[in-house]
């Protein structure tokens, strides 16, 4: 289990992690797993990395990953809440010699999304944020399991389009969306003038992680129809998700109970040297 961090731009600022839970050396048919081989070569240093070898000597890879969720329950102010964090989950990893010249194609995502709400968020000049729309709903993995997600829209025309869809929990909109993953840390510089001598320079790191929609189908899919997705199928998928969340909660409760039990065991008494008390 671990992450493969990919720099998607030449300046190595936008770093997109890809999570691998478990990768086997062979496929189900008994053949060598090419992805396992590539990952092992990276770990063993046979393929260069930016951190170890520098950007010029780092290996180039192409990854066909899938959107997944890292989900767990967290205690916040005495209340247990579900935390769902989007991430790139697994996929096929290929070594390549060349990359597409347009960096905008290096960190893309595509998904069929059932949209249930769109909210406008005003930007904050002091924090360096701009106006955007938050598109909420769900996507589906290869097992057709529900993955609740939200994406951003920063383009003005795009914001107007999604806000105008009128999507709601009673009247969802099913469509294809695509966009780019932003995962970068930049330094904000503040300069204070001095009455004399050197100025005071402060640098503050600012991290931005977002999944930004840059386009969508001209026409949404037909909702609640055979060949698309029906309300009955969605209801069944929602029931399956509740079962899945219950299993996460159970595992977490069992883990907490085992830790509490271990902490409650008194330490073994230390026998004094030269005495034998049975």
Language-model segments: what does each one mean?
Residues 1, 7-13, 103-131:
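Structural detector for short beta-strands of small beta-barrel domains
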Residues 1-41:
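Short, contiguous, well-structured surface segments enriched in hydrophobic/aromatic residues
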Residues 27-64, 156-178:
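Short nucleic-acid-contacting surface segments enriched for D/E, G, S/T with interspersed K/R
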Residues 54, 59-104, 180-243:
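OB-fold/S1-family single-stranded nucleic acid-binding modules
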Residues 92-97, 101-112, 137-140, 153-161:
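Charge/polar-rich, low-complexity and marginally structured segments
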Residues 222-278:
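A cross-kingdom feature that marks long, compositionally biased intrinsically disordered regions
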């Amino acid at each position: 289990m671990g992450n493969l961090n990919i720099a998607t731009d030449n300046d190595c600022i936008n770093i997109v992690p890809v999570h691998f839970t478990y990768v086997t050396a062979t496929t189900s048919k008994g053949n060598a797993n090419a992805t396992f081989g590539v990952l092992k070569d990276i770990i063993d240093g046979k393929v260069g990395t930016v951190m170890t070898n520098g950007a010029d000597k780092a290996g180039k890879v192409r990854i066909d990953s899938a959107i997944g969720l890292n989900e767990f329950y967290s205690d916040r102010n005495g209340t247990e809440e579900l935390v769902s964090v989007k991430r790139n989950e697994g996929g096929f990893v290929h070594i390549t010699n060349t990359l597409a010249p347009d960096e905008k194609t290096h960190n893309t995502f595509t998904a069929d999304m059932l949209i249930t709400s769109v909210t406008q968020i005003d930007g904050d000049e002091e924090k360096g944020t701009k106006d955007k729309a938050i598109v909420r709903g769900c996507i589906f993995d290869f097992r057709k399991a529900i993955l609740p997600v939200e994406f951003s829209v920063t383009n003005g025309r795009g914001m107007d389009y999604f806000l105008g869809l009128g999507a709601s929990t009673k009247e969802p909109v099913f469509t294809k969306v695509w966009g780019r993953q932003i995962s970068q840390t930049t330094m904000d510089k503040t300069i204070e003038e001095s009455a004399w001598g050197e100025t005071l320079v402060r640098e503050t790191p600012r991290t931005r992680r977002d999944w930004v929609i840059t386009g969508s189908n001209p026409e949404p899919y037909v909702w609640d129809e055979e060949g698309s997705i029906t309300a009955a199928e969605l209801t069944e998928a929602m029931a399956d998700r509740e079962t899945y969340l219950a299993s996460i909660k159970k595992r977490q409760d069992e883990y907490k109970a085992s830790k509490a039990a271990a902490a409650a065991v008194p330490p073994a008494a230390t026998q004094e040297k030269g005495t034998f008390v049975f």
